Amino acid sequence: MYLLTSLPDAIINKIKSYVVFCPMTKKNLKYVVALWCINENSKIETCKKYGHISLWNTENITDMSYLFSNFRFNDDISKWNVSNVTNMNRMFRSTKSFNQPLNYWDVSNVTNMNSMFYMTFGKYKAHSIFNQPLDKWNVSNVINMNDMFCGAKKFNQSLNNWNVSNVRNMDRMFGLSIQQVPKWYISKKQIDII
């Protein structure tokens, strides 16, 4: 029997290449995301220990709120399993450099997308560059889309396919974006709430 430390480096590196980070809680995931986003050196060390962020297994996570909020981040996470996530509140808030595809995420269980791509304002007048298709998203369970794309000035993708019949809050959903208001059926009940 070999101890891992007594194996040749080539074998250890091969074993590590199969390691996939599988966080059990939001706290675990948030901690490693923070390590990933500190700087390039930290990203390299985090990649060595946890594997590349694009390969992380997020199937156990139900809450991704604030996950990348205020971080400098633009890596591919399109293959993340988000099918159990219910909360994406402020997930990419103030992540001004993020512009990666997310169109094939299964967001069918998400109820909260409040400020998901929101960009804060201030003396620097920064704006999000996010402009990726999201037309394949099933948002039929979302209740809150308040400020979802507010400040995402580049976002101009069609969302006409979205079923927003359960949304109760769309305040400033497209504030300061160039997005045309989608052709959605919105009930009088929803208009009264908006």
Language-model features: locations:
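Negatively charged
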Residues: Y2-I194
